[in-house]
Design a protein with these regions (language model features):
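Membrane-embedded and interfacial regions of multi-pass energy-transducing membrane proteins
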Residues: 1-27, 31-183
Length: 183
């Protein structure tokens, strides 16, 4: 909590950085939900794109975990009780629940050990997993090709060189588009 207070009160524009971080995370979820809705509308979960959808769902689960762990980091009453409730939900799983909750908390109660554990997961571990899943998601998309609302399979009609005649090459067009989107 002291570090958040320091950033908010003593670092120049620290309050803006913190609020941009939290608001940006919420905005990112809006974009993720729109992306998932588009995938549902286009039927992107159907064959042959099931692997792309699976990677997308795993990305979503990791994003939810990332958001939950970030929610705990201000270490206020809301974040403490939120962590208490969510970790105790894991404790209700039959047979392994108590040990799983103890493993997640790092102690018998939500404490500094939980905060340190969630900080490390929020800043290092989950972003690395997310990066790997995003690379796998894009690689699977590159292999099968993206979907469209018309349901036209662009990879069916290929030229003599094996390049689809009805589509746009992934590189450089989508690569540049994605880089511009990230920036």
């Amino acid at each position: 909590f002291a570090s958040v207070e320091y950033i908010m009160r003593d670092v120049n524009w620290g309050w803006l950085i913190r609020y941009m971080h939290s608001t940006g995370a919420s905005a990112f979820f809006v974009v993720v939900y729109m992306h998932m809705l588009r995938g549902l509308m286009y039927g992107s979960f159907k064959q042959p794109r099931e692997l792309i959808w699976l990677f997308g769902v795993l990305i979503y689960v990791c994003l939810m975990a990332e958001a939950f762990m970030g929610y705990l980091l201000p270490w206020g009453q809301m974040s403490y009780w939120g962590a208490q409730v969510i970790v105790n939900l894991f404790g209700t799983i039959p047979v392994i629940g108590d040990q799983l909750a103890l493993f997640i908390r790092g102690d018998y109660v939500v404490s500094d050990a939980t905060l340190n554990r969630f900080f490390a997961l929020h800043v290092i571990a989950v972003p690395i997993v997310l990066l790997g899943l995003v690379v796998a998601h894009i690689a699977a998309l590159h292999t099968v090709g993206s979907n469209n609302p018309d349901g036209v399979e662009i990879k069916k009609n290929k030229g003599a060189d094996g390049i689809p005649l009805d589509g746009i090459p992934f590189h450089p067009y989508y690569t540049v588009k994605d880089i511009v989107g990230v920036v």
